[in-house]
Every structure is written in structure tokens, then in C-alpha cells.
């Protein structure tokens, strides 16, 4: 279920800052037509930190409604207060989602034991599979492989999204967590190499604007056709890099607007629109990738 090219989906807003649910439906249809293997709703790329609880739950529910069982829907439920993640998990238990993705608590820098207890508390109240999410570049805390292994022993913790970019961890996690534990890359630039080393796929930002290419690349990779996959990867590499020229999702939201995938590139403060000096850089990356 959790493999291939999974999109960390944008949350489209209208010019007045309200969520654009018609735009959300359009994005869902774009991804299904392109062969995307799954959707993460309201993760980091979906601007989870600036949505209200009510908006968060509604975006997830609407995504489930629009997808209508055609591909898996994963709900972002991360927070830096355990009770908040627990609340999201309870609210979404009957939503029809296929899994939850929960980022490590950010800013307050818990210990490894704190991280273990945080995820254990979430797992105990959720009735869907849980995906751990480690992105120390954003959270200032690193979920160490030994802690991942402890968590993998819990019944409904089934996967890890690893956005460290450290490819050595693929083999370490596989050895510690076993063959059945799902390993997903959270780093587009190293995602293909991650799968070459034994991962099952990627949760991707690039997928937002190059969905078919990403789906094709990871289909080829999972079939063991790495040379063909690498041709696509090299063409997309300018996107993998330049979609992070400013904090994500700023560049990818601008790019999606240029491609007509969303009508408005509005972001909620403290995120602001892509700096004008970066426009030609991202535009050139899209041109080099063959999507613009």
C-alpha cells in the first residue's frame, strides 16, 4: 500500500486566504491521472502549521472524499504537543484515511525517550497505520535508528519517512526494523538512491508539479530498472534542488501556479510568496525538467 511516488500535497488557498476546496479536488484528479501512488494531506508541504484544527480535519476529509478509494490517503497529524497529535488521530479515526504521518515534535527538542513515548501515545489511540517522520533540518531533533527500532515493535507503527538525506540509514533501519517495516524517503534529491538501497518509495515535493515523471521513475525503480529511472531522475534534479531554494512549500506553490495546477499561490504568514529574484531560477528548473 505505501510505496512508489507519494505526493506531499499542497493545500491551495483562495486570494482571501481561505482553503480552495475546488482547487484541492483539481489537484487530486491531476495526481490520480498521472499515476501518483498516494497522497499526504496536510503535511509540511500542505502548510499544516497554519491551518486551524477545523480546517486541518476538513482538508483531510475532503481529500478522502475526492480520492474515493482510488489511491491511499495519508493524513498529516504531527504536532509538538503530544496531546494535539493524539487529538488529530482521534478526530480522524473514522475519516477513511489509510495511514497517518506524524513528524517528530519540533522546537521543544525531546529526548529519545520522549520521542518514543510521544509516538507510543499516538499509536495507542489510532486505529490506522502510523508513519514516523524524521526531518531534523526542520525540527531540531533527530529520531535515531535505535528509537525507530523500538517503535517498529508497536503493532500499528509500520513505516518511516526519512528526510535526513543520510543514505547510510537505509541499511541501518532495515537491519534494526526488519524486512516488513516500510522505509520511505523524504528527500527528493536522494529518493531514487534510497530505493536502490532497499527503500520502498518517496513522499515527495517534486511530485506536486511533475507527478507523471515521478510516478514513472519510482515504478521503474521498484521493478529494478534503475538505469531507466536514473534518466528521469537526472532530468528532474534541477527541480529536486531548486524547489528548496526558499523554504518549502514556497517555491513549489509558485511553480504550481505557473503551471496552472492551482489558481492562486497564496501562502499563510509567516510564509510569504517566492522572492522575485528566485522566479527565473525555479522557472529554468521547470524548463530543464521538461515540464514548463
Curated annotation (Swiss-Prot):
Keywords: Amino-acid biosynthesis, Cytoplasm, Diaminopimelate biosynthesis, Lyase, Lysine biosynthesis, Schiff base. GO terms for cellular component: cytosol. It is found in: Cytoplasm. Pyruvate binds at residues 45, 203. Disulfide bonds: none annotated. It holds the Pfam family DHDPS. Its EC number is 4.3.3.7. InterPro entries: Aldolase_TIM, DapA, DapA-like, Schiff_base-form_aldolases_AS, Schiff_base-form_aldolases_CS. GO terms for molecular function: 4-hydroxy-tetrahydrodipicolinate synthase activity. Its main location: cytoplasm. The record marks 44, 107 as: Part of a proton relay during catalysis. SUPFAM superfamilies: Aldolase (SSF51569). It catalyses: L-aspartate 4-semialdehyde + pyruvate = (2S,4S)-4-hydroxy-2,3,4,5-tetrahydrodipicolinate + H2O + H(+). GO terms for biological process: diaminopimelate biosynthetic process; lysine biosynthetic process via diaminopimelate. Pathway: Amino-acid biosynthesis; L-lysine biosynthesis via DAP pathway; (S)-tetrahydrodipicolinate from L-aspartate: step 3/4. The active site is at residues 133, 161. Homotetramer; dimer of dimers. Belongs to the DapA family. Catalyzes the condensation of (S)-aspartate-beta-semialdehyde [(S)-ASA] and pyruvate to 4-hydroxy-tetrahydrodipicolinate (HTPA). This is 4-hydroxy-tetrahydrodipicolinate synthase. It comes from Vibrio vulnificus (strain YJ016).
Amino acid at each position: 500500500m505505501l510505496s512508489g511516488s507519494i505526493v506531499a500535497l499542497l493545500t491551495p488557498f483562495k486570494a482571501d486566504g481561505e482553503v480552495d476546496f475546488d482547487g484541492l479536488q483539481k489537484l487530486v484528479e491531476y495526481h490520480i491521472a498521472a499515476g501518483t501512488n498516494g497522497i499526504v494531506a496536510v503535511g509540511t508541504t500542505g502548510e499544516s502549521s497554519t491551518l486551524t484544527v477545523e480546517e486541518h480535519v476538513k482538508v483531510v476529509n475532503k481529500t478522502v472524499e475526492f480520492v474515493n478509494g482510488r489511491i491511499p490517503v495519508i493524513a498529516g497529524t504531527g504536532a509538538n504537543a503530544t496531546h494535539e497529535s493524539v487529538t488529530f488521530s482521534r478526530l480522524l479515526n473514522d475519516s477513511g484515511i489509510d495511514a497517518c504521518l506524524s513528524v517528530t515534535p519540533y522546537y521543544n527538542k525531546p529526548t529519545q525517550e520522549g520521542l518514543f513515548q510521544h509516538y507510543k501515545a499516538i499509536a495507542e489511540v489510532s486505529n490506522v497505520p502510523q508513519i514516523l517522520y524524521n526531518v531534523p533540518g526542520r525540527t531540531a531533533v533527530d529520531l535515531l535508528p535505535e528509537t525507530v527500532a523500538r517503535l517498529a515493535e508497536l503493532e500499528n507503527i509500520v513505516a518511516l519517512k526519512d528526510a535526513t538525506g543520510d543514505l547510510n540509514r537505509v541499511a541501518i533501519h532495515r537491519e534494526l526494523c526488519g524486512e516488513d517495516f516500510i522505509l520511505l524517503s523524504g528527500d527528493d534529491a536522494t529518493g531514487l538512491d534510497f530505493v536502490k538501497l532497499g527503500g520502498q518509495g518517496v513522499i515527495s515535493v517534486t511530485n506536486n508539479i511533475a507527478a507523471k515523471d515521478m510516478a514513472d521513475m519510482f515504478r521503474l525503480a521498484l521493478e529494478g530498472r534503475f538505469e531507466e529511472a536514473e534518466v528521469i531522475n537526472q532530468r528532474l534534479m534541477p527541480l529536486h534542488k531548486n524547489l528548496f531554494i526558499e523554504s518549502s512549500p514556497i517555491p513549489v506553490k509558485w511553480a504550481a501556479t505557473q503551471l496552472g495546477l492551482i489558481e492562486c499561490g497564496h501562502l499563510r504568514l509567516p510564509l510569504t510568496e517566492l522572492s522575485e529574484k528566485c522566479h527565473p531560477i525555479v522557472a529554468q528548473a521547470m524548463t530543464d525538467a521538461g515540464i514548463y
